């Protein structure tokens, strides 16, 4: 199987895929050379092909050549989004699949808004303007608008949007640290501030 991690960042999903099945033909694309450098170090001797490119311009990948395109929490940040979906459609095989993980609405899970607000309050103490502007196309954040975008880009495909809620158990500090990892905002905090959060 030919699998593409779209906006692969530092490569954690590619590493999981490689460790799980060494027979996959894996590619990762990201626009950030620094992230790709981290991915290269993480994936030493794996044979994973890493490509520097924007998601709106996947010319390094042939038409109808990818069986599965995965996009883990990056589609939300992309704008314009229509060319991204057009490129995904172009590179997918006729039976190919596209799966993207995106943020859901604030009311999608108990305590999600409270965790979000707590993290952002700490970040905004240091950077008052942080979070005032949402990156990416806002249509990605709504189920109906996302469904409409996907149906337009993939008119022949079965489009399904599922709400999945992550559930965690364990010591409070451990759960808090893991939950903070789901928010980009938590990574802009200095280590001491993040620890106090």
PLM segments and residue spans:
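Class I SAM-dependent methyltransferase SAM/SAH-binding core
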Residues: 2-58
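C-terminal helical/coil "lid" or tail adjacent to the Rossmann-like core of SAM-dependent
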Residues: 158-197
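Surface-exposed loop/turn positions
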Residues: 1, 65, 95-96
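A short SAM/SAH-binding and catalytic strip from SAM-dependent methyltransferases
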Residues: 68-81
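Conserved catalytic/acceptor-binding region of the Class I
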Residues: 82, 97-169
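Short, conserved SAM-binding segment of the class I
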Residues: 83-87
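Helix-to-beta-strand junctions that scaffold the AdoMet/dcAdoMet cofactor pocket
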Residues: 78-79, 92-94
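A short acidic, Gly/Pro-enriched loop at the edge of an enzyme's catalytic core
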Residues: 56-68
């Amino acid at each position: 199987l030919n699998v593409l991690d779209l906006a692969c960042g530092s490569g954690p999903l590619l590493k999981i895929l490689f460790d799980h099945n060494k027979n996959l033909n894996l590619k990762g694309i990201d626009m950030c050379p620094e992230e790709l450098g981290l991915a290269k170090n993480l994936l030493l001797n794996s044979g994973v092909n890493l490509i520097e490119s924007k998601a709106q311009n996947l010319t390094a990948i042939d038409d109808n050549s990818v069986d599965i395109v995965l996009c883990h929490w990056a589609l939300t940040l992309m704008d314009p989004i229509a060319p991204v979906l057009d490129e995904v459609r172009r590179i997918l095989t006729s039976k190919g699949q596209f799966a993207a993980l995106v943020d859901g609405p604030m009311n999608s899970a108990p305590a999600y808004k409270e965790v979000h607000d707590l993290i952002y309050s700490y970040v905004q103490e240091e950077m008052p303007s942080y979070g005032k502007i949402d990156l990416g196309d806002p249509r990605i954040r709504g189920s109906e608008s996302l469904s409409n975008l996907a149906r337009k880009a993939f008119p022949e495909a079965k489009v399904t949007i599922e709400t999945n809620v992550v559930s965690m158990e364990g010591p409070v500090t451990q759960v808090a640290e893991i939950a903070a990892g789901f928010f980009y905002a938590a990574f802009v905090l200095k280590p001491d501030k993040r620890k106090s959060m």
